[in-house]
């Protein structure tokens, strides 16, 4: 029996940094197993656990499997994949590693066919940055294989992001089709609407003018590829004029996540004064 461990990745917010091409531990683990298959190494999955939240890029993944193949042969495949990854991710996740160790035993495993079907299904599933808005130079469509867990069932959780419902539907349809090819169940849950940039927003102009008048600061307007509650409001009330603002936050959805307290206080005071002006 053997344990595979993928680590050394940065992770991060699956919307805010998805365009940085960081490694996804679940995707990498899947790749390792698929290359074992390509080298005619049979395996029986016993456990698979990667990621904590569907909206965070997974930093780690651990999996245990049984195989009758020689340890040296398996190790050679793992090292080849690891070296390829280090080259491919040297500009975005240079510390990536894949570790193979022997373990004593496994409680339960699934069959070779079931194991290969699961890995093949995951290998086909799209992941990461898909398209960007050329007008705003902002990620427009993405998805993230955030959590994979093997208990009584084998569950895979994705977060799909786009301000356009049609684009989200297309990605959802692809995942559903791939799942059906392997007789897996696909469930769409926690869907929330996005909202597109409104060039004619009067509220945004009022806010920008207010900050310029009161603080002498010219704000830089930016879009964000992340899920916001404002999208839910906009989905229910199509005519709403919406802007978002917030404090400085760093390394969101990682152990290093932090908030600039001074910027929070400044943002809050600015919002209060702006509301008084309206």
Where are these regions (language model features)?
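A short, flexible beta-alpha/helix-coil linker loop
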Residues: 10-14, 193, 249-252
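His/Asp/Glu-rich mid-to-C-terminal helical/loop segments that flank catalytic regions of hydrolases
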Residues: 22-39, 69-70, 116-122, 129-132, ...
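Generic, well-ordered alpha-helical scaffold segments in large soluble proteins
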Residues: 32-35, 77, 81-84, 174, ...
């Amino acid at each position: 029996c053997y344990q595979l461990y993928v680590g050394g990745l940065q992770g991060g917010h699956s919307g805010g940094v998805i365009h940085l091409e960081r490694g996804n531990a679940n995707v990498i683990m899947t790749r390792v197993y698929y290359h074992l298959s390509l080298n005619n190494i049979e395996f029986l999955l016993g456990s698979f656990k990667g990621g904590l939240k569907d909206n965070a890029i997974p930093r780690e993944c651990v999996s245990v499997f049984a195989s009758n193949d020689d340890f040296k042969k398996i190790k050679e495949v793992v090292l080849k994949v690891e070296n390829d990854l280090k080259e491919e991710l040297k500009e975005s996740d240079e510390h990536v590693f894949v570790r193979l160790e022997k373990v004593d035993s496994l409680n339960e495993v699934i069959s070779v066919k079931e194991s290969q079907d699961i890995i093949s299904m995951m290998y086909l599933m799209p992941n990461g940055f898909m398209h960007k808005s050329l007008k705003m130079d902002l990620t427009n469509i993405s998805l993230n294989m955030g959590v994979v867990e093997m208990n009584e069932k084998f569950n895979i959780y994705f977060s799909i992001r786009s301000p356009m419902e049609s684009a989200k539907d297309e990605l959802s349809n692809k995942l559903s089709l791939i799942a059906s090819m392997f007789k897996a169940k696909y469930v769409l849950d926690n869907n929330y609407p996005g909202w597109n940039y409104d060039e004619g927003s009067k509220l945004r102009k009022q806010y920008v003018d207010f900050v310029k008048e009161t603080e002498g600061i010219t704000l830089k307007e930016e879009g964000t590829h992340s899920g916001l509650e404002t999208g839910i409001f906009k989905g229910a009330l199509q005519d709403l004029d919406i802007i978002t603002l917030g404090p400085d936050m760093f390394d969101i959805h990682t152990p290093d996540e932090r908030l600039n307290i001074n910027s929070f206080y400044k943002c809050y005071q600015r919002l209060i004064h702006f509301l008084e002006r309206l």
